[in-house]
Amino acid sequence: MAEEMRQELSALAAIFCGPHEWEMLSCSETDGAVFRIHTTAEGLAGEDVPLELAFHLPAGYPSCLPGISVNSERLTRAQCVTVKEKLLGEARRLLSEPMVHELVLWTQQNLRHILSQTETESSNGTCTLPESSTVDGGLWMTLLRLDHMRARTKYVKVVEKWASELRLTGRLMFMGKMILILLQGDRSNIKEYLILQKTSKVDVDSSGKKCKEKMISVLSETKVQTEHKRFLAFEVKEYSTLEELQKEFETAGLQELFSECVLGLVK
């Protein structure tokens, strides 16, 4: 991890030092840092709106954009997505310099305006495309591996909900003990999915207590190529044999992905 990122994390921990303001979730040399900041901003009626801002600073940060997730019990999912898109736009302006504190301040200062703008567009029946739709040059794809699902029914519903809200398509695939998630969509939305996956209590531990997903692996992340099939929906599928799973990948034009990332998991 770069010294610049270490210094920024240290400064953020000192700035957001109030009760429950700062929460470091993971930090490593290879994957960077994932953390949450709990703050408030002024809403439409002048009220304090609680905000949960989750950030993933990848190893290449600040030369590349952070992953950002926005959640609030007072905002709709659509409003949270809009705030995230605006934040990513601001992040692009600040690229190559430490930016997290600036982004938090910007959110606090601009939330009311963003919500007002969203409300106006909604009442006028207009629909604007997300700013991030062309940031990374089209559709991206990532393949994830989960170690286990103890609370499978609940876990599956949460994954389906996230995929729907973030406009991601693909597959949640079960074969024996193997669990894979293949996602296609806008890269910033895939990044937000990963933040949600790592920061939300989606499963239970051996004692039945709710817990966060700590055993998730990113097997591949790449742009969708012309030979790859575009998934039209997100589906949950179960396979009895390795051949069935392989056929799913081959049908989608992902033979190479299967050979490089999946085959070795069952040997």
From Swiss-Prot:
Interaction with UBE2I/UBC9, as annotated region: 13-15, 100-102
Subcellular location: Nucleus; Cytoplasm
Any one GO cellular component localisation term in the record: nucleus
InterPro entries assigned: RWD_dom, RWDD3, UBQ-conjugating_enzyme/RWD
Pfam families found in the cross-reference section: RWD (PF05773)
Residue ranges occupied by any RWD domain in the UniProt entry: 7-114
Gene3D superfamilies: Ubiquitin Conjugating Enzyme
Entry annotated with the keyword Magnesium: no
Keywords from the UniProt entry: Cytoplasm, Nucleus
GO BP, one annotated term: positive regulation of hypoxia-inducible factor-1alpha signaling pathway
Oligomeric form and interacting partners: Interacts with UBE2I/UBC9, NFKBIA, HIF1A and NCOA2.
This protein's domain notes: The RWD domain is required for the sumoylation enhancement activity.
Role of this protein: Enhancer of SUMO conjugation. Via its interaction with UBE2I/UBC9, increases SUMO conjugation to proteins by promoting the binding of E1 and E2 enzymes, thioester linkage between SUMO and UBE2I/UBC9 and transfer of SUMO to specific target proteins which include HIF1A, PIAS, NFKBIA, NR3C1 and TOP1. Positively regulates the NF-kappa-B signaling pathway by enhancing the sumoylation of NF-kappa-B inhibitor alpha (NFKBIA), promoting its stabilization which consequently leads to an increased inhibition of NF-kappa-B transcriptional activity.
The name this protein goes by in its record: RWD domain-containing protein 3
UniProt source species: Rattus norvegicus
